[in-house]
Structures are given as structure tokens and as C-alpha cells.
């Protein structure tokens, strides 16, 4: 669309990665160009850019205020991370239409470079949620005398690195629960569940190895299952709004009375989802692995193991099973070479998330009926996706995982 003699106004970023996607982190320099194409000479008062990053939360609730009276309560909150303005052409005052200070731009294409530095302090990862978002953008404004300004806004992605190679994220997660079913005056045997995963931190594209034992001493047929859930929490005016959504799930074999099932590293793959957001005061994004037993006619028995979805994959010697790493010192530059004896590295964000996926959310995933009842509502997979390119690191999976378990008495004979 031609606006006067301005044919086009665009913004392009100088990307820091090979995938040509504008992705930045705190402390990075964001640079780019405002591209202006005109079909004839134009007079310009100013060409400005405005860059901003902020988290914003908003939701409404309906309340009763007496007989046949209701009102809507709005909850909003905002956190600003940075606010940068710069003038590429002209001067600050746009209301001055005097001939002095006008700049003439000739017909053709013109580029005007801009640059600014993101704060060194941690920034929240870009995110689009049900009741809030974290967004970063650059807006260009072209002001001309006696004409409306031409404006354009373009977003860029910011993410904070979460390195899963930290002691807290490399520690195993485990738990045990038991449930006894009662029906009037009759009590059946217990249903017991024990589950363990090798660590707390993972990256998208990895598969979680689940080690579990389910013992059914009840009289009912039960089904062991597992699911990854994302929890979005939004905070405003002292209130909190939470949304829980299914990310991935799996189902085990039905387990009849007196039987036991063991999972020796059953795999559940993490789809392309946004990293955990843990440092924003008004938006929090967390993940959990739920290993549970579907019990017909009763509340399910479930075990909740916390997860952190990071951006930097597991180091080759980050695994607890690497004994060589603690016994020798060497130049780590050799890691860039091929290591045929090691398992394949977890895929990078660029491999996991395509450009098409980045533009479109995941299709809704149908949730399990039992968890719909527990959460009192349907679940929707509304996951913000990114196309990241973390360092090309490798991971190591223990070829002989510890499968030992505590000896438990078998179900009592009936």
C-alpha cells in the first residue's frame, strides 16, 4: 500500500545465529536497519525508533453485588524491562511544521542503522499465555509535515538461558505413594506407586526415562499412565490466575488384581515448548511430570515430579554416570569433534521447532478424563513455541541405568 510518496517502511534485524531468526538474551546488542523506500522526493521531520520490552497480565472476573446486580472486576499488572528511544533523522519536536529542520529524502531505497543494548539484568523469556504475555519489539515512526506519521512495529524474541547442567537440575526426582480403596464396610488391598526420573532438568526434544513400579493389590483393574503438564500462573493486584495444560502423555498396560508392572526407562518425549519462566514477578511457567494410576470409580493415585525445561542441553560430562570426567583434566575444545561412541546429542531448538511451528501453536491435545475431573475443567495445549539455537553440546545417557528397587512384599494371597 502506497502512503503518499512512501512506498514501504520495514525493519530488519542483524541476527546473532545462523538460522536468521532474531533471538537475543540479556546483555546482547540488538542491531538492525529501518528500510525506507520512496517513489519521489519527500520532506521528513523525523525518523524515530522506540524499543520496549515488558510483561503484561490481564484477566476479568464477574462478581455479584446483590440482587440482580453484577459487575466485572479487571485485574491488570505490567513489568517493564527496558524502554529505549532514538532519533535516526531529524529532531524531537514533531509538532513543529516550520520549514527549518526538514530533511529531504530522494527517490529510491534508504537504510538507517539502529543499535541498542539489552539490560544486563535477567529478562523474562518471550511468551504468549492465556492471560498474559512477555513481548519485545522495535517500532519505527516516520513523521512528515502536514501528514499522518507512518508507523511499523516488529517483534523480536528474548530468552534467558537455563543451563540444566547445574547440581539442582541434575539431581534425581523420585517419590512413592499408596492408596487403599474402601467400599462401605469392605476394605481392599492397597495400590502402591513408586516412580523415579534421572534428573529434574530437560530440554525440548529429549525423552524422559521413567522408572516406575505399580503394584495392584486391590480388587479392581487399574491402568498406569504418565503425563507432562505445563502450569501458567499470572499475578495481579494480589490475586493469582492459574492455567494447567497437557503437553504430552503415555499409557501403560491394564493391571489386573494381584499384578505388578515395572517401567524400566519408559520414554516420554518432550515436544517443542517454551522454556520454564521462573524469574518474572507476574508470570510464571512451570512443568511437572505426573505418574499416576487410573482407578475406575475412585480418585486416581498420582505422583507429581517437578521438571525444569531449559535451553542448554546436557554436557557430555554432565551426566552422573561419567566417572572419567572427575578423574582427568583436558582441553574441552575436542568436544567439537565427532564422538561416534557417544549417543546422539539432544536436538537443538532450531531442529526441534520449525518456522511454521513457531508461527502456529500446537494443536490441542485431548486430556485424560481422570485429570479433567481432577482439574475441574477441560485441558488445552496452548503452548508458546520458539526456534532457539543453543550451543552444540552433547548429552550422555547411561547405557546401564540403576534399576534396583526396594524389595516390597507381594500382594497378600486371597
From Swiss-Prot:
Protein name stated in the entry: Arrestin domain-containing protein 3
Record keyword Membrane present: yes
Family stated for the protein in its record: Belongs to the arrestin family.
Motif (PPxY motif 2): 391-394
Subcellular location: Cytoplasm; Cell membrane; Lysosome; Endosome
Subunit text: Interacts (via PPxY motifs) with NEDD4 (via WW domains). Interacts with ADRB2. Interacts with ADRB3. Interacts with HGS (via PPxY motifs). Does not bind TXN (thioredoxin). Interacts with ITCH.
Signal sequence residues: none
A Gene Ontology biological process term: protein transport
Function description: Adapter protein that plays a role in regulating cell-surface expression of adrenergic receptors and probably also other G protein-coupled receptors. Plays a role in NEDD4-mediated ubiquitination and endocytosis af activated ADRB2 and subsequent ADRB2 degradation. May recruit NEDD4 to ADRB2. Alternatively, may function as adapter protein that does not play a major role in recruiting NEDD4 to ADRB2, but rather plays a role in a targeting ADRB2 to endosomes.
GO cellular component: early endosome; lysosome; plasma membrane
Comp. bias intervals (Basic and acidic residues): 405-414
Top-level lineage group: Eukaryota
Annotated motif PPxY motif 1, positions: 346-349
UniProt keyword annotation of Protein transport present: no
